Structure formats: C-alpha cells, structure tokens
Regions:
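Bacterial Sec-dependent N-terminal signal peptides
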Residues: 1-29
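Glycoside hydrolase catalytic-domain context in secreted enzymes
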Residues: 23-542, 546
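Hydrophobic alpha-helical segments, chiefly the membrane-spanning helices
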Residues: 550-552
Length: 552
C-alpha cells in the first residue's frame, strides 16, 4: 500500500470518528458536551487548520465546477477556510459544503454568511424605516421571515443587525440603522437578534430556519467626525456609553452569536485592533461569548492607518480579541509566522479557533453539515404570499405622514384632506424614482428580486385598474453628472438615464402635471447614492441633482 492510499485511509477513519461523536453530541447539547467535543477536535488540528478557521474569504458567484480549480477551493480542501460569504443559492452552497466536509482532512463544515439586512428575497422597509414603526413585534417578525428565507437558501449567518447610532445625516449609512435614539436602537437590536436566532436566548439556533446574527459595527461607527465614513471618533466615555453603546450591549444581552468590528478609530486606535473595545468592554464587561469578525478587509485597511505591515496589523487584531478575518487573509497568511516569532501565543490562537468552532457547534453543523441545505425549502419558504403580505403590512406601518390638509391652490379648493386619494380623475407620478423597479427595495437588499417589484407608477396603475388615469413624467435624471450616476448604479441597480436636455425633461413634467388632479412626486436618492465608503456633503435635494426644480 503506497503512502497516498495510507493517507486517504487515515483521513477517512478520522472523519468517521468525528461523525460518530457529532451524532451523539448534538442530541445532548450541554455546555460540557460541547467543550469535550471541541477539545477532542482541536487536539487533531494542526496550527494551519486552526488558523484556517479564522479565515473568511469572499466567493462571489462561485460554482463547484469553478471552485475546484480556484484558490478558494484549494484552501477549503486544505482546511484553510472557516466560512464563506456572498454565495447565493442552496444548491451551490450544498456543493461547497460537501467540498469542505468530504475533501478536507477533518471535514469541518463551513459557515455561510450574507448581508441579510432588511429581508432576503421578500424585502421589508430599510432599517431606518422599520424604526419608524416603533413596533418591536413587527420588527422581530421581519427578521424572523428574513431568517426563514435566508436559511432556506443555505445561509447560516447574517451580518445584521446594524445598530450604530447616527446623528449626522451626512453619513452615508444612516439608512442601515435605527437612527439617533439609543433606547429605541437597543429595543430594535434585541428584537432583531431574537428574530434571527430564536425567541428564547437560552434555546437559540436549534431549528433550521434560525440563523446566527452579527451585531455591527462595534463600535461607534456612526459617530465619525463630519459624517465621513471610516473617519475618526473622539468622544468622552460618558457620551460614549450614554448615547452610543447601549444598542450593542442590548444585542449581547439577547444572545447575539457574533459581532463585527468597525472600520473607525476609537481613542486613536482602529476598532479592529482595539483591545479595550473587543476584550475589556465586549467580553469582560458585557459577557459576550460569541466570536468577533472584521468588516470587509478590515485588517488590511489598518495598514493605511500607519500601524504597520499586514503581519503587524494581523497580530494586533488577534491580540485585541478579533477572531475571524474577512477577506484580508492576513490571519491565514501571517499568523503562523507570528506564532513562531512569539508575537502571538498558542493560547490566543486556540481561543479564537474555539470560538469559531463553538459557533458551528451551536448552529448544529457538526451534527448535520447540510442543516441549511434542504433543496426543497426554497420553493416552500422563499418569497411566499404570506411573507409578502407581512412586508406590505409592516411597510404601511412604517410610513410617516407629516401633513394631510385640504388642498388649496391654482384656483382649486378642497373641503377634505388630500389623503386618502379618491379612485377617480388623473394622478401624475412625477420624478426620476417614479418608474424604477430596481431602486424600490432600497439599499443593502443584496438578494432581492430586482425585476419582481413594480415601480410606483406600475403599482398605481395596477391597483386602480381603469378607474384612474395614471400618467408619468421623469422630470429630470436622478443625478445630473453622468459619471456620478454611474457610480450610483451598483449591485444591479439601474437609473435608466434619459439623454434629453434638462429643459425638455422639465417641460414634459410640467405638461403632465398640469393635466392632473393629483401629483405624486417621487424624488430623493437611489439605493446606492450613498452608503459604505460614501457620504453626502449636501443632504437636501439640490445638486448633484436637478430634482429641486421639479419640487418647486
């Protein structure tokens, strides 16, 4: 028997032994059983495999056929990947999970994460809109439905809730959080964690429609100076804990399974390398027992902070209390060298590896690596009639009516408030967001069916049938600058630029509006005009748009 066959046989025996352990341990579910299982597993792991559990590369739309020849696939087979994110489709995820379970030496299953922020394929209002409901049951239901759909498509981990308090409207990610109030933010954080993971904090993640939540971005991400994304945060501890920290703590108290480090500095130290934040506050003060993941390239971006090279920043992050490296691959590329040089200890490495393995254990992946890979579930559990009805109801609950008075002007006077509209006459939809499908779901709706959402114009026509004459005019392009507009058409969103002159667009809108009894103005931002790494210096409708002319 040659050495290759001996290795294969040994690997098979090891995998069989592990499967035998998992089949019994998942039935008992005690902390002691989990500790014994992970102790036994870690004794079998090499240093490289332990470091591999801390590695979270991005996949894109990889398939098994493509993956087998890819660098990511090779690393999976070598045990150098702990999880993947941005892989959509349960069949694809099942195939990649099979690669990890059957082709790696120890068969350790992968985590599969995605930004499931305000729905999966059934989309709910953006988080800022959800906060306007002040209805924790509704917000929890939105997370419960999102977890049901995401888990049906193979996802076991969501990078949500985003609970950053924001008080500067120029910041590009205001829409992802609940606004400026820490009490409301804390209540929403709890509701969403329980919605994703299960209602009972002591009995979560048991079902295959419950997924692990990730509170983010720890900490103070929404407090960057001048509303600039990734910027420095410098404030007193009194203000920090009274105005910004409570929502993170509320998520921890609800049992959140993971936390994401933020990009910004706190007290001059990047959060991703901030021991006081990640260890002293998060773990020691609040008792967090999950794992910490960086944001996208959060480790490698610290090189730009001037801390040092990739090895130095990777060492700083691990020693601070970060457990998983998203995309940078600083951990998998440098930690073994740092261990040899004494810059990290085996105790620190083992602690980080253990926390990742504990998350997989709590999710039940050692008992059934394909727990989230039931190929029959998507047709049954995604974009259902019941889910869409809930989304519609919660969206209506989120609306904020600022003013509803009788109309008076242009020689006309009404004795009743404008709303509700009567189903008669002519209604003109005016504005660049009036007839766009892809921008209806809002920002961070990465799994949305962009072509399945009717535009405002289409929806009104369908709802009123032939009883109301619904007309439309664009009035202006969403953004005057074509180059800027191209930047704002991310993630499959389309703005459908109209190349007519500004005057012709405005004249058309005036003509359409003059023939209407009611005008519905659809103005504002596209889904991606601001967001991660983007902020606005002007927060009103003006340049770089021509929309102000329509509103006047």
């Amino acid at each position: 028997m040659n050495m290759k066959k001996i290795f294969k046989r040994t690997s098979l025996l090891l995998a069989t032994a592990l499967i035998g352990v998992t089949a019994t341990v998942q039935a008992q579910k005690s902390p002691q059983d989990m500790d014994r299982f992970i102790d036994a597993l870690m004794r079998r792991m090499t240093v490289e495999e332990k470091i591999g559990q801390l590695n979270l590369p991005v996949t894109g739309e990889i398939t098994t056929g493509q993956a087998k020849s890819s660098d990511v696939a090779k690393k999976i087979e070598q045990g150098l990947v702990g999880g993947l994110f941005n892989l959509k489709g349960v069949a694809k995820i099942r195939d990649v999970q099979k690669l990890a379970v059957e082709n790696s030496r120890l068969g350790i299953p992968l985590l599969f994460g995605m930004d499931v922020i305000h729905g999966y394929e059934t989309i709910f209002p953006i988080p800022l809109g959800l906060s306007c409901t002040w209805d924790m049951a509704a917000i929890g239901q939105s997370a419960r439905i999102a977890a049901t759909e995401a888990s049906a498509d193979g996802i076991s981990w969501t990078f949500s809730p985003m609970v950053d308090i924001s008080r500067d409207p120029r910041w590009g990610r205001v829409s992802e959080g609940s606004g400026e109030d820490p009490f409301l933010g804390g209540a929403i954080a709890r509701a969403m964690v329980l919605g994703y993971q299960g209602k009972d904090p002591d009995d979560q993640l048991k079902r295959n429609d419950e997924i692990m939540a990730c509170v983010k971005h720890f900490a103070l991400y929404g407090a960057g100076e001048a509303g600039r994304d990734y910027n420095t945060v410098d404030m007193s501890r009194n203000r920090m804990f009274n105005e910004y920290m409570y929502p993170y703590e509320a998520a921890v108290r609800a049992g959140v399974g993971s936390a994401m480090a933020s990009f910004n500095e706190v007290d001059g130290v990047p959060a991703t390398a901030n021991h006081w934040l990640m260890t002293d506050v998060l773990r020691k003060q609040w008792g967090f027992n999950g794992f910490v993941v960086t944001d996208f390239t959060g480790i490698s971006e610290m090189v730009e902070h001037g801390i040092g090279n990739l090895q130095t920043v990777s060492t700083r992050a691990l020693n601070a209390g970060v457990d998983m490296d998203m995309v940078s691959e600083g951990f998998v590329g440098t930690l073994k060298k740092s261990l040899t040089e004494g810059k990290i200890t085996m105790k620190t490495l083992d602690a980080a590896c253990r926390r990742i393995l504990e998350a997989k254990y709590k999710l039940g992946l050692f008992d059934d690596p394909y727990k989230y890979c039931d190929l029959s579930r998507p047709a049954r559990d995604i974009f259902t009639r019941e889910h869409r009805a809930a989304a519609r109801r919660i969206a209506a609950e989120s609306f904020v009516l600022l003013k509803n008075e009788p109309f008076e002007g242009q020689g006309k006077k009404s004795s009743r408030p404008v709303l509700p509209l009567e189903k008669q006459g002519t209604v003109a939809v005016i504005g660049p967001l009036g007839n766009t499908r892809s921008n209806m779901p809002g920002t961070w709706s990465v799994a949305a069916r962009l072509d399945d959402y009717p535009s405002l114009y289409e929806g009104l026509k369908e709802m009123t049938a032939s009883r109301v004459n619904i007309t439309y005019a664009k009035g202006s392009n969403l953004i005057s600058d074509a180059a800027y507009e191209e930047r704002a058409t991310l993630f499959g969103r389309s703005l459908n630029r109209d190349n007519r002159t500004d005057k012709k667009l405005l004249d058309e809108a005036l003509k359409v509006a003059s023939g209407a009894d009611v005008i519905v103005a659809a103005l504002g931002e596209s889904s991606e005009m601001s967001g991660e790494s983007s902020s606005l210096s002007l927060i009103h409708i003006s340049e770089p748009t021509r929309q102000a002319e329509i509103s006047y």
